């Protein structure tokens, strides 16, 4: 198990990194805008100086070509950048292209069930982000979703990692 921080706040990232337990970071332009603004690329590069592991950076485009262009640009910033692509038909297409043709690691995000995670795995995702807090908020069992996804990864021989994301309270991490 690895612990990632979801933030663009440099002080939060610095404090978390100091604990010695953080292995990566996930972030997006909205988090950066609410954490002091400035150039998103510069913010990501500063985070990369604080974190030794991967940093997942989310695209804002909604169409496949826009996502692809942003993903390629983000991947040029540093070899540790993992591109966050939202779960959608366009997102799956882009994931397949990035992982298969461009050798760019992808974190498919905003997933609410194991079927979505399975599709992301089949598209070649390096990471699948299941929104645990939101799954629980909807009245479903996030633990079962995580177990089903882990089982599919094991049985299918995938090397992808699961990110249990969108933790909203203590109950989400028990």
Label each PLM-derived region with a short phrase:
Residues 1-14, 19-22, 27-101, 132:
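Active-site beta->alpha loop and helix N-cap motifs at the rims of alpha/beta catalytic domains
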Residues 92, 105-107, 112-174:
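Catalytic alpha/beta core domains of metabolic enzymes, predominantly
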């Amino acid at each position: 198990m690895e612990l990632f921080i979801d933030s663009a706040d440099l002080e939060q990232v610095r404090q978390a990194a100091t604990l010695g337990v953080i292995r990566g970071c996930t972030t997006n332009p909205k988090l950066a805008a609410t954490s002091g603004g400035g150039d998103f690329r510069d913010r990501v590069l500063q985070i990369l100086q604080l974190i030794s592991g991967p940093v997942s950076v989310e695209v804002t485009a909604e169409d496949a070509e826009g996502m692809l262009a942003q993903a390629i640009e983000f991947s040029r910033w540093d070899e540790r950048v993992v591109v966050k692509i939202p779960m959608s038909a366009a997102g799956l297409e882009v994931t397949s292209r990035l992982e298969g043709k461009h050798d760019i690691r992808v974190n498919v995000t905003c997933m609410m069930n194991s079927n979505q995670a399975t599709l992301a795995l089949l598209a070649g995702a390096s990471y699948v982000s299941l929104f645990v807090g939101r799954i629980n908020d909807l009245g479903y069992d996030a633990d079962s979703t995580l177990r089903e996804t882990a089982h599919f990864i094991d049985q299918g021989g995938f090397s992808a990692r699961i990110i249990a994301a969108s933790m909203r309270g203590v109950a989400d991490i028990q």
